[in-house]
Amino acid sequence: MATIKSTDDTFETLLKEHKILLNDFWAPWCGPCTQIAPTLEEISEEMKEITIAKHNIDDEPNLPTKYGVRGIPTMLLFKDGELKATKVGATSKTDLVSWLKENI
């Protein structure tokens, strides 16, 4: 499954529809965000139990504020609608997969 788009308006629906949701807060001008984007695409294909959503903070600023996002990329991992873990900054695929497995 490819990554999907998250918006301020669709986020609550995404939480309800997907058992495990990784919401990536990013912006097009953010170097580390664009660096980690291909890794997130790969993980979305390999770990099909996780839905990965991308939330552009420039276009949709309310949700990042609600969750206290101060730097990007920030990834919030939700399971059954509850926030389970937060990861800030770009990281290697190995580290990201390990973090996901530890928290799901």
Regions found by a protein language model. Give the residues of each.
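Residue-level signature of catalytic and energy-coupling elements of molecular machines
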Residues: 11, 23, 40, 56, ...
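Non-catalytic, surface beta->alpha helical segment in thiol-disulfide oxidoreductase systems
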Residues: 79-104
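Short pre-active-site segment immediately N-terminal to redox-active cysteine/selenocysteine motifs
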Residues: 19, 25-29, 71
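Conserved redox-active cysteine motifs that mediate thiol-disulfide chemistry
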Residues: 25-39
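Structural micro-motif
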Residues: 61, 67-76
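Thiol-based oxidoreductase modules, predominantly thioredoxin-like and allied folds used
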Residues: 6, 37-62
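A short beta-strand-turn-helix
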Residues: 3-20, 61
